[in-house]
Amino acid sequence: SSDVCSSDLQAGKGTVVSSHPLNVGGVGETGCLAANLLAKEADLVIGVGTRFSDFTTASKWIFQHPEVRFLNINVSNFDAWKLDGIAMLADAREAMTALDAALADSGWQAGWGAQIESVQSRQLKETQRVYQAVWQEKSFVPEIDDHLDRESVYREFRQITDSTLTQSSVLGVLNETLPAEAVIVAAAGSLPGDLQR
């Protein structure tokens, strides 16, 4: 009711459906464009049940507003005090219900306006771009162009899998073909981050 946008983390991915108009996706190092753009401008971040790990905060870099404050709703006293936030030791559902009612009673509205739709549109374009990534022997540059010996890694990948599918293109196919209630389970590595994005 107050147009507060919502971002999620890997552990809380299923708490708000990704199609909700105020859900801007995952935030942080493994997050997505939409959430990270808004995180840079947020003056209040409400963390619900989060540990505010380095992945979430991009080592505290992602929240760049000079007056950003944190309200941390958590059952863990240790995590509730992180980032010098205001600690609210409470059950997540009860606290959010009370907060929503208080905001509705006061008539307060978030100031994001059309900015949410704008970053979601940019995110959709970015998602389609990475879904369409095609490996090409001579000119392929990965999204994360690190220190690996690419030619050796690509050669080994092709030998083991007899494939040149990129991880993001496979995720695109899965996202477009699996039923809405399907669940993908991922382990460690780059896959959880790609799934969150």
Model-derived features: where do they sit?
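Short connector loops at secondary-structure junctions
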Residues: 10-24, 89
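Short gly/pro/ser/thr-enriched loop/turn and capping motifs at secondary-structure boundaries
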Residues: 13-18, 53-54, 77-81, 96, ...
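Phosphate/diphosphate-binding loops
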Residues: 28-81, 86
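General beta-strand structural signal in soluble alpha/beta enzymes
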Residues: 7-10, 47-48, 88, 184-188
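Short internal beta-strands
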Residues: 7-11, 71-74
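Phosphate/pyrophosphate-binding active-site segments
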Residues: 71-185
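Short, small-residue-biased leader/transition segments that mark boundaries at the very start
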Residues: 1-6
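Acidic-glycine-rich active-site phosphate/pyrophosphate-binding loop
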Residues: 183-197
